[in-house]
């Protein structure tokens, strides 16, 4: 039986979509602070919500439904040949978990944004932007460090929830782009979910028509929230 919950939400003004420039975007923003905890947020994830900083939101666009929440079952996931190669390529890295936001994280983030996303909405990077996006007062994120010979070359931020993980953002040293650390970060979070008995890894929103957002469809099988129901997807798009 599905439990119905009445939520108090606000609606942002319309503005240009950052994924599909020809569309107008509006967001539902949670106003009910009773759900600002790990278990409450996990329930909201199943309904298509997402965290950014302290805020929880969900797309509520007037003429578009391109954003689809996507999640991967940690036990059912089957890596592709290329994903297996990426995992093998990065076996020389040390993975370290931390709840402390270390100064070297921002230094790496700043370099990543300047060199990889200088044409995007996150440029120029700033400490205020970094904290406002990743930090959360009611649930500190977990940082998954990727180190080579003790040198930090990548960080994946994720929310560790009772029965799932929710991937937030990954940034890395552009000098190591050939390692495909973004893919490796997702594979590592799936490994962490499986190792700790957590069922799902949430990857946020898939937008098929946006190159920066459609990479998520390569992790199979996965589920997408379509018209209020989670649908299993087990084949690659044509």
From Swiss-Prot:
Protein's cellular compartments: Cytoplasm
GO cellular-component term (any): cytoplasm
Swiss-Prot/TrEMBL keywords: Acyltransferase, Cytoplasm, Transferase
Keyword Oxidoreductase belongs to the record: no
InterPro entries on file: Acyl_CoA_acyltransferase, Asp_Glu_LeuTrfase, N-end_Aminoacyl_Trfase, N-end_Aminoacyl_Trfase_C, N-end_Aminoacyl_Trfase_N
Main location class: cytoplasm
Single GO molecular function: arginyl-tRNA--protein transferase activity
PANTHER family associated with the record: ARGININE-TRNA-PROTEIN TRANSFERASE 1 (PTHR21367), ARGINYL-TRNA--PROTEIN TRANSFERASE 1 (PTHR21367:SF1)
Purpose of the protein: Functions in the N-end rule pathway of protein degradation where it conjugates Leu from its aminoacyl-tRNA to the N-termini of proteins containing an N-terminal aspartate or glutamate.
Protein family per UniProt: Belongs to the R-transferase family. Bpt subfamily.
Protein name: Aspartate/glutamate leucyltransferase
Natural source organism: Aeromonas salmonicida (strain A449)
Higher taxonomy: Bacteria, Pseudomonadati, Pseudomonadota, Gammaproteobacteria, Aeromonadales
Gene name of the record: bpt
């Amino acid at each position: 039986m599905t439990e119905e919950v009445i939520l108090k939400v606000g609606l942002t003004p319309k503005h240009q979509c950052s994924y599909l420039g020809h569309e107008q975007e509006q967001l539902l923003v949670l106003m009910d602070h009773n759900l600002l905890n790990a278990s409450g947020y996990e329930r909201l994830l199943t309904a298509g919500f997402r965290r950014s900083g302290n805020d929880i939101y969900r797309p509520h666009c007037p003429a578009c439904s391109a954003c689809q929440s996507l999640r991967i079952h940690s036990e059912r996931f089957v890596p592709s040949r290329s994903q297996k190669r990426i995992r093998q390529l990065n076996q020389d890295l040390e993975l370290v978990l931390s709840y402390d936001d270390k100064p070297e994280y921002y230094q790496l983030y700043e370099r990543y944004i300047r060199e990889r996303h200088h044409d995007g909405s996150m440029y120029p990077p700033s400490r205020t932007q970094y904290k406002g996006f990743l930090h959360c007062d009611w649930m500190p994120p977990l940082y998954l460090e990727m180190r080579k010979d003790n040198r930090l070359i990548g960080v994946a931020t994720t929310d560790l929830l009772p029965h799932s993980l929710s991937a937030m953002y990954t940034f890395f040293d552009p000098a190591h782009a050939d390692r495909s650390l973004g893919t490796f970060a997702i594979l590592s979070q799936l490994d962490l979910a499986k190792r700790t008995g957590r069922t799902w890894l949430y990857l946020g929103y898939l937008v098929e028509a946006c190159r920066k957002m459609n990479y998520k469809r390569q992790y199979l099988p996965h589920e997408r929230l379509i018209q209020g129901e989670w649908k299993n997807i087990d084949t690659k798009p044509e």
